[in-house]
Design a protein with these regions (language model features):
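Gram-negative outer-membrane beta-barrel transporters
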Residues: 22-23, 605, 612-614, 631-717, ...
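Extracytoplasmic beta-strand/coil segments of soluble accessory domains associated
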Residues: 26, 45, 49, 77-121
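N-terminal periplasmic accessory domains that precede
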Residues: 76-79, 98-103, 113-116, 133-136, ...
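Short acidic/polar hinge/loop motifs at secondary-structure boundaries
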Residues: 121-150
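Transmembrane beta-barrel wall of Gram-negative outer-membrane proteins
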Residues: 178-180, 184-216, 220-289, 311-326, ...
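Acidic/polar loop-and-plug regions of large Gram-negative outer-membrane beta-barrel proteins
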Residues: 237-239, 244-318, 347-391, 445-475, ...
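Structural signature of Gram-negative outer-membrane beta-barrels, strongest in the C-terminal barrel
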Residues: 397-399, 409, 413-425, 467, ...
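C-terminal beta-signal and adjacent terminal beta-strands/loops
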Residues: 616, 654, 707-715, 733-789
């Protein structure tokens, strides 16, 4: 599927979905709360006008733009740390996160997280290999708020996501001109400018435009810009008595370095970690200029050139529209978008733990001579070395989605909604995995050339190998779903809702065959003796799936300030491109149950949610260091309790807490049955005290967040234990008069060493006290000054 420009223009002008709340003045931020029961949410509701959180029979977290800033997020995925029940591993950088929801099993990426903009998914499959939804989105000052729905009725709406739906709602123009110019500076060469402007064009016509540009060297010294790029967005809104339509466009061009596990020292059965000599865990990285620009052979006489600084960036265009209007007794809502662009991965993927150079050479059964690729000179035999691969994944993606809904009041208090969801999407993939290099195990590693005494050449420009897994694939998918939902306010206290959905999916594609060859025909050049190449011949992927989902919910008001809710749903996850390529053709089936309590008043807000989910046919896939594509399938179950609350005992003091306790286990999963679901902590919580002052010239808010992440396992076998850790973030917001805003934040100010990932490519525990893990970034600070009008 390749759409012409005319299709993009049509998508931008077509009708689409959500009526959002107006942005609130910054000075009112202290009165805002992510758990305010009177807030109106539009995510997970059948009708465009939404529902108050106190009346909702599902779990949803909201955060305003200022609350997101106070969370000190390092990326889009990192912003999800404010959501209980969600665990986002964002130590890989600004993109390429692994996000997990309520114990739902996956090996990584974010198959159970859909990111929406104004109610439309950015890409219908929430995850493909080397691409998850949060990578496609950048937060800036054009965003009004974030809503995160967990479970609930989401299996029947939009793309049927059974996990978490993250909806970013854009600011729109209003009657009065409004905007801001924000300049940001920070540690590690951070520089950023954000611009937003909005206003009225004419009677009933409104506009907004904004974007950002940012460059930073990063907390980890890569010797090149770790993040560099920006985006530009615009909306045009027309309102009339019977409705409103908004069209929008967004272009993002951003490059982001990607970080994978590095060697660390592990003691006391993994409970104590420290930096590997020569490689600082908080600020160090193997990445550097020595192998930033490389040429990789892809076949006999063919090669590609790549820049490590391109990382896991995007060059993406989004065109969309939302429309809500009345026709007689009917309400019609539509969400539509068209997305096109590229999302490459150029990253260094590590494998086994370091060893001395002499030990590495001895593994070939011969003596040898080792020199640096750049600068020459002999390498000390005692130098610690490792092999790591320069993996290249090129993805060209395209999608069109449309979510059309018709609602009608059947009788007083009862509204029926019927809808159709349609998505057509494609991905064109070219992969070169492997390309291992012999590197020094130190900050900004250096490549090593190695020649054995018996004449064998181990490396070429430091490369010990070529691609062990090459892939050329071209995939197309189409999903059509019909759904029916009913909302019934039975009386003043009881509200019921339910819905059903039936979906058809058609996926087809072409995957080229591969062969393993010796590129130069010389057995003594070891570096290219086993090169995976793509062949002209190919095999077809062609599968149709159909499935049914349902949901039932109830909310009962106990008092004016408290209510309880219950929810049951049965959903599914249809196999995506990569699943079908690897032969995982089964539909995942998910049953979920929730029981919740909500209460709130001027002095407090409280949400408690108990949940249970059960999975069948859950696949696992990982590329191991030796090139093996390991796959298996099984079941799981998880239950837990989420808490989200705030207490305001006196004056401007607020004490906020979010957290989750989780018990998730594998079932019917080969030898892994009974193990803890990998990569997800049993406990995590965030405690945020803050204080707000009203000053003669404005207002000031200071805050801090203490976060604790519990033990996890990095692998299915539960042999790589990742110890618990904690972090401390701090910040302050100062508003001066009506126009000026100043903010200062610090992330991980105590410079803690915590791991978000082990090395799934090398199953097993630490070897000789050395462990491969991906640590969180060290401390960093940001300062911004904004002028608002």
């Amino acid at each position: 599927m390749r759409y012409a420009l005319s299709a993009a223009i049509a998508a931008a002008l077509a009708p689409g979905a959500v009526l959002a709340q107006d942005a609130q003045p910054a000075a009112a931020a202290a009165a805002d709360s992510a758990t305010t029961l009177d807030a109106v949410v539009v995510s997970g509701t059948a009708r465009f006008k939404g529902v108050r959180k106190r009346d909702a029979s599902f779990s949803i977290t909201t955060a305003s733009a200022e609350q997101l800033q106070e969370a000190v997020p390092l990326s889009t995925a990192d912003a999800l740390k404010v959501v209980p029940g969600v665990w986002a591993e964002s130590a890989g950088g600004s993109t390429g996160a692994n996000i997990f929801v309520r114990g739902m099993p996956s090996e990584g990426d974010a198959p159970f997280v859909t990111v929406q903009m104004d109610g439309a998914p950015l890409f219908p499959p929430p995850t493909l290999s080397f691409l998850e939804n949060s990578t496609l989105f950048r937060m800036d000052d054009t965003i009004e708020r974030m809503e995160v729905l967990r479970g609930g009725p989401s299996p029947i709406f939009s793309n049927g996501q059974p996990g978490a739906t993250v909806n970013f709602i854009q600011k729109k123009g209003g009657e009065e001109p409004a905007g801001s110019l924000r300049l940001g500076l920070g540690s590690d060469g951070f520089r950023r400018v954000d611009l937003f402007n909005s206003g009225k064009l004419g009677e009933g016509w409104y506009y907004s435009v904004g974007g950002f540009y940012r460059s930073t060297d990063g907390v980890r010294d890569t010797q090149f810009p770790a993040d560099k790029g920006g985006q530009l967005s615009a909306t045009l809104t027309h309102s009339w008595d019977a409705g409103e339509i908004t069209v929008y466009a967004r272009h993002t061009d951003d490059k982001n370095a990607f970080f994978t596990p590095i060697p660390l020292l592990s003691r006391d059965n993994g409970s104590s970690l420290s930096s590997f000599p020569g490689l600082n865990a908080q600020t160090g990285t193997l990445l550097g200029n020595d192998f930033r620009h490389v040429t990789i052979p892809t076949g006999r006489g063919t090669s590609i050139s790549r820049d490590l600084a391109d990382g896991r960036g995007i060059n993406l265009d989004v065109f969309g529209a939302s429309m809500d209007f009345y026709v007689g007794d009917w309400t019609i809502s539509d969400r539509v978008n068209f997305v096109t662009g590229s999302a490459p991965t150029n990253g260094l993927f590590t494998g086994a733990s370091p060893q001395t150079l002499s030990s590495f050479i001895a593994g070939y059964g011969s003596a040898g001579t080792a020199t640096y690729v750049n600068g020459g000179g002999a390498v000390d035999p005692n130098q610690q070395v490792l092999t790591a691969g320069f993996w290249v994944v090129d993805k060209e993606i395209e999608s069109f989605t449309n979510d059309l809904r018709f609602s009608k009041d059947l009788f007083e208090g009862n509204t029926l909604t019927a809808g159709v969801y349609f998505a057509k999407y494609s991905s064109k993939d070219t992969w070169y995995l492997g390309n291992n290099m012999l590197l020094t195990a130190q900050n900004n590693a250096r490549r090593i050339n190695l020649t054995l005494a018996d004449g064998r050449q181990v490396t070429r420009d430091g490369f010990t190998g070529t691609s062990f897994f090459s892939l050329r694939g071209d995939y197309d998918g189409q999903n059509t779903a019909v759904f029916l939902a009913d909302e019934w306010q039975v009386n003043e206290r009881l509200r019921l809702d339910g819905g059903i959905r039936y979906e058809w999916q058609q996926v087809d594609g072409t995957v080229h065959d591969t062969a393993t060859v010796d590129l130069d025909g010389n057995p003594n050049t070891l570096y290219d003796n086993a090169t995976s190449i793509s062949l002209p011949s190919s095999r077809r992927i062609d599968q149709d799936d159909k499935h049914f989902s349902w949901t039932l919910g109830a909310n009962y008001k106990l008092t004016d300030n408290a209510s309880v809710f219950a929810r049951a749903n049965s959903g599914y996850k249809l196999p995506a491109f990569d699943n079908l390529r690897d032969g995982n053709t089964k539909v995942q089936e998910i049953d979920q149950y929730e029981l919740g309590f909500k209460s709130g008043a001027q002095s407090y807000d409280l949400y408690l949610t108990a949940f249970y989910n059960k999975f069948t046919n859950s696949p696992f896939q990982a590329f191991l260091q030796d090139g093996t594509n390991f796959t298996t399938v099984g079941d799981s179950r998880a239950y837990g309790v989420e808490v989200e609350g705030a207490w305001r005992p006196v004056g401007g003091l607020e004490l906020a807490l979010t957290g989750v306790w989780l018990d998730a286990k594998y079932e019917n999963y080969r030898e892994f049955t009974g193990n803890q679901v990998m990569r997800q902590p049993k406990q995590q919580f965030r405690f945020t005290p803050s204080y707000y002052w009203t000053l003669p010239f404005g207002d000031l808010k200071v805050f801090a967040t203490y976060s604790r992440i519990g033990d996890r396992y990095a692998d299915l076998a539960n042999t790589q234990k990742l110890p618990s850790y904690h972090t401390l973030d701090v910040g302050a917001n100062l508003h001066v008069g009506e126009h000026w805003e100043f903010a200062a934040t610090g992330s991980n100010v105590s410079n803690e060493l915590g791991l978000t990932e082990g090395n799934v490519r090398v199953p097993g525990a630490a070897t000789g006290g050395v462990f491969m893990g991906r640590p969180i970034a060290g401390r960093s600070y940001l300062f911004s000054a904004a002028y608002k009008w």
